[in-house]
Amino acid sequence: MLMPKRTKFRKMMKGRNRGMAHRGNSLAYGDFGIKAVEHGRIDSRQIEASRIAMTRKVKRQAKVWIMVFPDKPLTAKPLETRMGKGKGSVDKWVMNIKPGRICFEMAGVGEELAREALALAMHKLPFKTKIVTRDSENELY
């Protein structure tokens, strides 16, 4: 699973996820990609499930880039625990996703196979996404 090697602080405040993505909103390496259309949070298990779905579909012919990294700790208290007694322990690592953010990129295969593989990965994500290409990436969200 993806997670930082070390952080300055173990726990982080929840914060807010507002606005559009100003960086990471265009294809950097590949010819096809998955772009977020709405706000959301992606965790390391969802990233890994999407990566496995894509690579199995293309049978390792394509190069896949993961353009997101979960760097925010999400805490949870144990079940049947009373309120209080401090913040819970770190449960999983997530990344806040803003609309316009490219999550995955792919190159090295035809457009039809790439669209099928990216569609499989899109089903693993908890927010609405769309497939973009080098030609269509400048469209509105």
Swiss-Prot record:
Q: Which UniProt keywords apply?
A: Ribonucleoprotein, Ribosomal protein, RNA-binding, rRNA-binding, tRNA-binding
Any one of the GO CC terms: cytosolic large ribosomal subunit
User: What are the protein's GO molecular function terms?
Assistant: rRNA binding; structural constituent of ribosome; tRNA binding
Annotated GO biological processes are:
translation
Report the sequence similarity comment from the record.
Belongs to the universal ribosomal protein uL16 family.
* Biological role: Binds 23S rRNA and is also seen to make contacts with the A and possibly P site tRNAs.
Q: Which InterPro entries match?
A: Ribosomal_uL16 (IPR047873), Ribosomal_uL16_bact-type (IPR000114), Ribosomal_uL16_CS (IPR020798), Ribosomal_uL16_dom (IPR016180), Ribosomal_uL16_sf (IPR036920)
How does it associate, per the subunit comment? Part of the 50S ribosomal subunit.
Please indicate which superkingdom the organism of origin belongs to: Bacteria
The name this protein goes by in its record: Large ribosomal subunit protein uL16
Task: Specify one Pfam family.
Answer: Ribosomal_L16
Q: Which organism is it from?
A: Aliarcobacter butzleri (strain RM4018)
List the disulfide bonds in this chain. none
